[in-house]
Amino acid sequence: MTQTVQTNGVQPLSKTWELSLYELQRTPQEAITDGLEIAVSPRSLHSELMCPICLDMLKNTMTTKECLHRFCADCIITALRSGNKECPTCRKKLVSKRSLRPDPNFDALISKIYPSRDEYEAHQERVLARISKHNNQQALSHSIEEGLKIQAMNRLQRGKKHQIENGSGAEDNGDSSHCSNASVHSNQEAGPSIKRTKTSDDSGLDMDNATENGGGDIALDGVSEIELVFRPHPTLMEKEDAAQTRYIKTSGNATVDHLSKYLAVRLALEEMRKNGEASPINVEAASEKQYTIYIPTASNQFTVLNGSFSLELVSEKYWKVNKPMELYFAPTKEHK
């Protein structure tokens, strides 16, 4: 194969290409002329239609002039502004946006394969939102379960500690009368402490751990803490549930909806433990709309709290007393 090349009008030069063994042996592919169609799954084309930067389908495709790699217009322009002025795929130098060219033919090809691009993107967003919500729900359930386990361990350790203290006090009592008086005085001081511990344990909340570590009364910088006494509604709840008083200490930025969601998940976990169920379906279905939160007002009346109110706002607007705020809960009528 010979080709004549003109060089600046001086004299024509001839250049010969020699075919390789592969080129000599290969046979050309036959053109399809009978209208045959080959079905190709769009999923198999995903790697060809995907932007290497955002890993999503190409949008407003731009092609590099040097290496012919394709990227989304926004992705490659952002990469050139903040990166090393090189192709993210092969690291060839790209001086500026002048090294790129739009590729409308490739965009037209994608629109042929995915005619409803907006519907596809909306479906992707719904799937991602569902996955994110499921993961957040699992993380919340796992956090509450871990809290219950730590609480049980703390109860066991406190029980052993009180047994050891009571045992040592009894031994000292047999040694001398002075030690006997000291042990009696110590037991009298320990009595209210044991009673308070029992009350906190019955509430089912992990508050004593923070108190033992010396951090129970220390609030975060710039964030106030609210102490709550959380009881079932005296008239809207059944009598057997009336003893479920809970003591909570949380951030003042938390809202009433956060409190309702915590209550729904906590009660679902307790019900699951009580019935021995292994499936977390009830926990995942827990919602802040399952319970309504009330605050007592004058003359034994109860006011329904708006879910968007923060606990700090509720305290300033309704409570105004320097003691733990009392709230009441009951199932929402439409969720009964």
From Swiss-Prot:
Pathway: Protein modification; protein ubiquitination. Residues 176-190 have a biased composition (Polar residues). GO terms for molecular function: chromatin binding; histone H2AK119 ubiquitin ligase activity; ubiquitin protein ligase activity; zinc ion binding. The keyword Hydrolase does not apply. One of its GO terms (cellular component) is chromosome. It catalyses: S-ubiquitinyl-[E2 ubiquitin-conjugating enzyme]-L-cysteine + [acceptor protein]-L-lysine = [E2 ubiquitin-conjugating enzyme]-L-cysteine + N(6)-ubiquitinyl-[acceptor protein]-L-lysine. Residues 93-98 are annotated as: Interaction with nucleosomes via an acidic patch on histone H2A and histone H2B. It is found in: Nucleus; Cytoplasm; Chromosome. Disulfide bonds: none annotated. Residues 2-179 are annotated as: Interaction with HIP2. A zinc finger (RING-type) spans 51-91. InterPro entries: RAWUL, RING1/RING2, RING2_RAWUL_dom, Znf_RING, Znf_RING/FYVE/PHD, Znf_RING_CS. Residues 158-218 are annotated as: Disordered. Its EC number is 2.3.2.27. Keywords: Chromosome, Cytoplasm, Metal-binding, Nucleus, Repressor, Transcription, Transcription regulation, Transferase, Ubl conjugation pathway, Zinc, Zinc-finger. E3 ubiquitin-protein ligase that mediates monoubiquitination of 'Lys-119' of histone H2A (H2AK119Ub), thereby playing a central role in histone code and gene regulation. H2AK119Ub gives a specific tag for epigenetic transcriptional repression. Essential component of a Polycomb group (PcG) multiprotein PRC1-like complex, a complex class required to maintain the transcriptionally repressive state of many genes, including Hox genes, throughout development. PcG PRC1 complex acts via chromatin remodeling and modification of histones, rendering chromatin heritably changed in its expressibility. PANTHER family: E3 UBIQUITIN-PROTEIN LIGASE RING1 / RING 2 FAMILY MEMBER, E3 UBIQUITIN-PROTEIN LIGASE RING2. Component of chromatin-associated Polycomb (PcG) complexes. Component of a PRC1-like complex. Component of some MLL1/MLL complex. This is E3 ubiquitin-protein ligase RING2.
